[in-house]
Amino acid sequence: MHTLQYIAVEADNKQQAFDKVVVSLSTREDGYRFADWSDWHVVGGGRFSEKAHKNIMDGYTDDPTDILGFAEDKDKFQETLVQIGKWKAQAMNRAIVEFKPDKFISDMVDYASEGGRSEYSGDVMMSAYTMKEAATMLMGGWTCDSGLYDLEENIAEATYIKERLDKPEQAVRQYLVPVDFHF
């Protein structure tokens, strides 16, 4: 599956913003991947980019074209932050519907009484996964449903970028870099 995420970064220009994101998402020599929930990505929006809408093969190349700079288009930048907030609300509402607290507690009791898991159950795993993803989002952690990651503050929330937008000297240096993540 693919998900569009925006990486919020402070930079002097689009190219520098692009480069910061490319470097931060690169796998380190020790195998560490910053976006550990994703197996690969395309910086610049990938299949969600304007270029890919014209030619799907352009969706597999890193490209800085679709990066949003606050100084260049304040309205589109703000609209994107609003849209990200809607994505987050949709993800949390899905979790509310999918999460079954009684089932989760029952699974925990079974686990404790058995001294661990005696067999794999997809039903048990999905209940736990829903809980884990919702809790991760509530704590500002980055998931496939976060929609945004603030590289400057290391949190998957828009709180700090919104604060930076309130300071004119910082606002002009704010960028949202679209990234197509596969997971």
Predicted regions and their residues:
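Short, extreme N-terminal segment that most often corresponds to the first beta-strand
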Residues: M1-D39, V172-F183
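Conserved aromatic
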Residues: V9-A11, A71, A128, E152
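Low-complexity, serine/threonine/proline-enriched polar segments
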Residues: V23, R28-S146
